[in-house]
Regions:
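Short, Lys/Arg-rich flexible segments
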Residues: 1-84, 92-93, 98-143
């Protein structure tokens, strides 16, 4: 039977060992820093696609853009910390912001797709990683 040993870099292991009981609060701070970067990119992409390329005059109210936000960091069932960029529900007219965002992202019959989430995800990936790394380094230095 084959055996494989994976070793983490020493400097990373030292950072993690310094966190000890403060890990949860540090994870929240780091995820918040990364989430803010992605949220900013999603907001700019959303504002650039709303009302663009329509056959009729746009009826946008700004409610979808105003409902975009960042969830608090939570622990999922696998024990991992998560943070989500999403839309607050429901709309003032009783509709769903997620439904409207889905129609914008993927289109529907007679309405072409205007992706804003997927391009934001790919464009902000490295910037998000950098922001989270910087936030982790700052939190470790505080300890």
């Amino acid at each position: 039977m084959a055996k494989c040993d994976m070793k983490m870099p020493e400097d990373f292991l030292l950072k993690i060992s310094k966190l000890d009981s403060n890990f949860d609060s540090v994870a929240d701070t780091v995820l918040q820093a990364g989430g803010e970067v992605v949220l900013k990119k999603v907001k700019s992409n959303l504002s650039s696609v709303i009302g663009r390329g329509t056959k009729f005059k746009s009826r946008t109210t700004g409610e979808l853009e105003g409902a975009l936000g960042l969830s608090p960091s939570k622990l999922n069932r696998d024990g991992n910390h998560d943070i989500k960029v999403g839309f607050a529900e429901p709309r003032s007219d009783g509709g769903s912001n997620a439904k409207l965002a889905n129609i914008l992202e993927y289109g529907k019959r007679g309405q072409p797709a205007k992706p804003f989430l997927k391009p934001a995800k790919t464009a902000s990936r490295q910037e998000c990683i950098d922001a989270m790394t910087k936030a982790l380094d700052e939190e470790v230095e505080k300890l």
